[in-house]
A protein has these predicted regions:
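Basic/polar, cationic surfaces and motifs that engage anionic cell-wall
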Residues: 2-9, 24-25, 106, 111, ...
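Conserved, mostly hydrophobic/aromatic
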Residues: 33, 115, 133
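Residues immediately flanking
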Residues: 35-36, 117, 156
């Protein structure tokens, strides 16, 4: 049975149109951790929010040229200071995983929730981010029992060779200690 839980009460809701319905009767059974910063390695900018809300100015920085026309989203984005922005209700399919496979199944967006951390693969994440991520993860584990600890993965795990996030700087044991 699909949980009615759609919005995290500690998150600021943000407008986003880059999502659609999950396949009928699809059970949410995977949590995917990502990282993002725009420009890469710069924090506290409005550009990630602009990307997910579809208003990014692709001329604002030379590295944004590849973002022209890109339609991507995540369910949530956790900033460095720990604030959580939510773009897509959990019962809807966000467009975060791209070409992906987990446990023999393709199209991970169909059955996953995507959480973006503001960061890079090699920059340590903040204490506030781990706290916010653990609070959100605990809530998701309660609401979606098919998400088990072994089904909390990085983007690198579902798209190896294509993606590397959340990277070597992400402390998996720290997250799992916090969600016990």
């Amino acid at each position: 049975m699909m949980s009615e839980f759609s919005w995290f009460d500690m998150a600021q809701r943000r407008p986003c149109t880059f999502f659609d319905d999950r396949p009928e009767n699809e059970e949410i059974s995977l949590l995917v951790i990502h990282n993002i910063s725009l420009p890469a390695g710069e924090y506290g900018t409005p550009y990630v929010d602009d990307l997910f809300t579809g208003v990014i100015n692709c001329h604002a920085h030379p590295s944004f040229a590849d973002l022209e026309g890109l339609r991507v989203s995540a369910h949530c984005f956790i900033r460095r200071e720990g604030s959580v922005l939510q773009y897509v209700p959990f019962n809807k399919r966000a467009w975060h995983a791209g070409t992906s496979e987990f446990a023999g199944r393709n199209r991970c967006n169909d059955f996953s929730i995507g959480i973006e951390l503001e960061g890079t693969d090699d920059t340590p994440y903040t204490h506030a981010q781990y706290i916010a991520l653990s609070e959100l993860t605990r809530k998701l584990l309660c609401e979606f029992p098919a998400i088990t600890h072994d089904r909390i993965v990085g983007h690198c795990d579902i798209a190896p060779g294509r993606k590397t996030d959340p990277g070597a700087a992400f402390e998996w044991p720290r997250l799992f200690d916090l969600i016990k």
